[in-house]
């Protein structure tokens, strides 16, 4: 093995794959008050009042709405935190995390 072969091997960088992204979804229900949903979106996802209202209304009209797209661990943590806030308040509020396509 020549010195050139060794140098070439040292300069080769491993290919790093980007982590797969996940989307957090807000699932509409007929019981959780709109104001509470917006409050959760503001608290957990740091949304403005206007952005939270838009996401909530999209879920209300379409049945589901994408809240945010982020890394898997962050998406799962945020979805659980937001769902837990609903449960603590006695509402069936549901957020899920699933792979972004």
Swiss-Prot record:
Superkingdom of source: Bacteria
One BP term from GO: proteolysis
Assembly and binders: Binds to the N-terminal domain of the chaperone ClpA.
Entry similarity comment: Belongs to the ClpS family.
Function: Involved in the modulation of the specificity of the ClpAP-mediated ATP-dependent protein degradation.
Protein name: ATP-dependent Clp protease adapter protein ClpS 2
Protein's organism: Rhizobium meliloti (strain 1021)
Gene name of this polypeptide: clpS2
């Amino acid at each position: 093995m020549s010195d050139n072969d060794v140098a070439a091997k040292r300069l080769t960088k491993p290919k790093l794959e980007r982590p797969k992204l996940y989307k957090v979804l807000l699932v509409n229900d007929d019981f959780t008050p709109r104001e509470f949903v917006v409050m959760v979106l503001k608290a957990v996802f740091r949304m403005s009042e206007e952005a939270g209202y838009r996401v909530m209304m999209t879920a209300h009209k379409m049945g589901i709405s994408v809240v945010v797209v982020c890394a898997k661990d962050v998406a799962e943590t945020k979805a659980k935190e937001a769902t837990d806030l609903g449960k603590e308040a006695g509402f069936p509020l549901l957020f899920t995390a699933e792979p972004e396509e």
